[in-house]
Amino acid sequence: MKSLHVAANAGDLAEDCGILGGDADDTVLMDGIDEVGREIWLDDHGGDNNHVHGHQDDDLIVHHDPSIFYGDLPTLPDFPCMSSSSSSSTSPAPVNAIVSSASSSSAASSSTSSAASWAILRSDGEDPTPNQNQYASGNCDDSSGALQSTASMEIPLDSSQGFGCGEGGGDCIDMMETFGYMDLLDSNEFFDTSAIFSQDDDTQNPNLMDQTLERQEDQVVVPMMENNSGGDMQMMNSSLEQDDDLAAVFLEWLKNNKETVSAEDLRKVKIKKATIESAARRLGGGKEAMKQLLKLILEWVQTNHLQRRRTTTTTTNLSYQQSFQQDPFQNPNPNNNNLIPPSDQTCFSPSTWVPPPPQQQAFVSDPGFGYMPAPNYPPQPEFLPLLESPPSWPPPPQSGPMPHQQFPMPPTSQYNQFGDPTGFNGYNMNPYQYPYVPAGQMRDQRLLRLCSSATKEARKKRMARQRRFLSHHHRHNNNNNNNNNNQQNQTQIGETCAAVAPQLNPVATTATGGTWMYWPNVPAVPPQLPPVMETQLPTMDRAGSASAMPRQQVVPDRRQGWKPEKNLRFLLQKVLKQSDVGNLGRIVLPKKEAETHLPELEARDGISLAMEDIGTSRVWNMRYRFWPNNKSRMYLLENTGDFVKTNGLQEGDFIVIYSDVKCGKYLIRGVKVRQPSGQKPEAPPSSAATKRQNKSQRNINNNSPSANVVVASPTSQTVK
């Protein structure tokens, strides 16, 4: 084996720098295969001519002896600066120069082993400062003559090198140098970050993320060169036993975020080296601290930058249109599909405008008067957002008398302001809250509704009008039409309106037109029926008809001194029967209304409800329960005896139950039916009174054979 000769004046420098301290037993690669026995001489610039060789092939590039890889040498801060030997003006590159490596292409291990580190010895011809003595100066930190290792990123930066933050910054390094300092890149086999983004470089949008790691693309895999040393291979196998957790964590993060991270965006985040050192010390130091710090940095980047950029990109791509405020007839655009964010404070929702069907000139209605027949057309989509929540009480059928009314409904005129001769048209029974109106009025009224519906106060007022079923929308529009119909409707209203409307409409009204409902002067005595009709009534039905007669005359609420509050919601009402006001102390409630508005009952025993009496302001503890009844239920309100006695309720009177929309409590009110003036309640007819009445009727109707036949039947039944 040949030995390595070094000039005397450069020997100390080589020994100090650890460059030429190799083992003589190892093989030295020469520039020529046939000149194996030549001695290797390094050029000495100190001036000793005996050691200067004038031939070009005496310059040696690198030697792979493990002993020359000294770990204390400074490192280059940037990977592009590490390159293989190149030719210079003074000493060209030798022919067939071979650079050896101490690693394999499939290994990734720690850099703590000096024998497994990468090193490149640059020739003296690459010195960026000409005419400088490399081997005689004694400065081992000169990057032109030192072995550089990429495994350690601890570098003494000075302003002349131009590395760091900007041009010449000294204390700020980029993120790749940061991860190198954290021993993230200390393996012999660097992973190629550009391979992760190889498919996304051309199509990735750089605006998809905010800030990621800087200069990841510059970390190109250093070409692995063929290793001819068996000893170095054994050292590599021993280093494979240590798993690099930091590299695995970082690589996993890159793979998970490769959809949103492009190679061009990995240049933006910079962290000072002093910050990394301080954070590592606070976390306890060592490799575990570096691993924890790496996870924190990656989590911070992903949470505060990647998601923020995604949110910004998403919001910029969405275009919002202002709320639909203009008249639909001025902008009949059938493709109004812009996204409008939903809002609870507005009564408008995104919908596609559809031209309305032809106007129905023969139909004018009101939100409160929904019991009038409506055309079987689907509601216009532009009106649907204006609708309030549907009424909680179920609508009755559109034909026939209402369930709680005992009077048939005569036909109504086309523009009748009363809608129903009984004075009640239902609680918004019309599913279309804003129905069809004449074309001349539709635009003005729609604009009025659009403006009023946009405020909360308007919604409150509209709900109050629905509860009272009296609205002022069409008062001025229908006055002229209603004046012609008032005279012919007064007789019908006098019979039924006063009896039913106040029961279902607990509203204080005045006779001077405080509301536009007409209250006629009700006669003290009901109209006399023909004698034949009187005699046709069976004796057993007289008691029921007599109890029904006072029901036609009810004291209005204004005479009882009670005014409804705006926050009360009508739930149900019940006309009291004999069993409800008897000694049982319970009132049977309507099944449908009870199931709809009162709390749901799971057990048969029911629940206790605190009912506040509106008239006396007293709270009654009543029990709400049900009885099973042939696969159905009968709902009861028990403990009502004291309430009935206090309010003096009798058969034919009724109760009304409300709920307070603000506090959720229940309120009950007993309404007495006014007895006709000069008329006393009838006592149950006795058998003697029945005989006398039948005898008098027989004397009156002696000249009527048909009447005698009619009267004979109930008389014979009574005797039997």
Swiss-Prot record:
Expressing tissues: Isoform 2 accumulates only at the end of seed maturation.
Molecular function terms, GO-annotated: DNA binding; DNA-binding transcription factor activity; sequence-specific DNA binding
Residue ranges flagged as DNA-binding region: 572-674
Polar residues compositional bias, start-end: 129-146, 687-700
Subunit structure: Interacts (via C-terminus) with SPK1, SCAR3, ABI5, APRR1, AIP2, AIP3 and AIP4. Binds to BZIP10 and BZIP25 and forms complexes made of ABI3, BZIP53 and BZIP25 or BZIP10.
Note: The truncated abi3-6 mutant lacking the DNA-binding domain is unable to localize to the nucleus and is an embryo stay-green mutant.
Name this polypeptide is given: B3 domain-containing transcription factor ABI3
Name of the gene this protein is made from: ABI3
